Amino acid sequence: MSKYNVMRWNCNKGGPGANCFNKKCRPKIEVFCDCFPRGISFGDVDGIVEINACGLMLEWKSNTEKLKYGQVTMYKNLSLLGILSIIHVVGNAETMKVTHMGTIFHGVQSSLFPATLDDVKDKIRQWVKLAEERKLYVPITW
């Protein structure tokens, strides 16, 4: 068994689409909409990891359209202190072919730029190196 957190799910168990992960396992987060003011609601997380009290969040999109206003606002606010960094990747999740990436850090969103999966991995490794060198509650920069 792999030590990595690999998605193990068979959407076709019981027939085509009968065991769809989104239907069977994702919470219906829209039921909480009435708990928040001003149209605010939960969003899903594509990926998140923590090392030495630093978080790296993966936001995966299938096209280069701008992130939604609420997402950008949240990511900028959560990244202000340097504890959370966001990597925005554009690509095909089925094939893992990446076309673009960008970052949000210290409240600043970069523009998307052409990238490959290897570029994304390199950026993640840069973040890991800095996070591993970090002393608790001292913001990192990359």
Per-region residue spans from a language model:
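Conserved catalytic cores of phosphodiester-cleaving nucleases, focusing on short active-site segments
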Residues: G47-V49, C54-N63
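Catalytic cores of nucleic-acid endonucleases
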Residues: D34-F42, S62-S110
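N-terminal first-folded block
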Residues: G14-E50
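Domain-level recognition of nuclease-like catalytic cores that cleave nucleotide substrates
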Residues: Y4, R8, G14-I29, G91-W142
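Alpha-helix C-cap/termination motif
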Residues: E50, L78-L81, L130, R134
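Hydrophobic transmembrane signal anchors and adjacent membrane-proximal interface regions, especially
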Residues: V6-W9, V31, V72-Y75
